[in-house]
């Protein structure tokens, strides 16, 4: 058993961090928090507008602030944005205050799941596959570096992935307080 006060879901966009995370949070009686939603609430505008008018550095600053605020609490499942792991301080904090679950997905499955998504700023490019491939190459090693558990969600329905994660988490994670 690996005790931690929070569960933290990491992985690329489209992996299921939010949809599966909500189900896992309910099963384990955890508060569900999504960093992207918390950023929108804090900024008072959507993520696309933050990127457009303030730039990615401002978005990443807000992301770091929100993540650290969330991780100061306990009994939560935190679904992070795909790029949250780019900041070394975010990685350190997630490892210290959470049991980190990497939801892994391949680029082709991402393309299928995100085919109709027009809201993610990093996908507003002509060649989405190249963008996702580049993000995968940069971020994959960082996801693996901090993961306590890796679950591949390719070819899994949300129900199947949730059931598998519940089994895996029951075997490997113990909810604790003051684990940091």
Swiss-Prot record:
E.C. designation(s): 2.7.1.71
Keywords: Amino-acid biosynthesis, Aromatic amino acid biosynthesis, ATP-binding, Cytoplasm, Kinase, Magnesium, Metal-binding, Nucleotide-binding, Transferase
Binding site for ATP: 14-19, 120
Biological pathway: Metabolic intermediate biosynthesis; chorismate biosynthesis; chorismate from D-erythrose 4-phosphate and phosphoenolpyruvate: step 5/7
Cofactor: Mg(2+)
Lipid biosynthesis among keywords: no
Any one GO CC term of the record: cytosol
UniProt-listed SUPFAM superfamilies: P-loop containing nucleoside triphosphate hydrolases
MF GO annotations: ATP binding; magnesium ion binding; shikimate kinase activity
Family: Belongs to the shikimate kinase family.
Function: Catalyzes the specific phosphorylation of the 3-hydroxyl group of shikimic acid using ATP as a cosubstrate.
Name under which the protein is recorded: Shikimate kinase
Source organism (scientific name): Xylella fastidiosa (strain 9a5c)
Gene: aroK
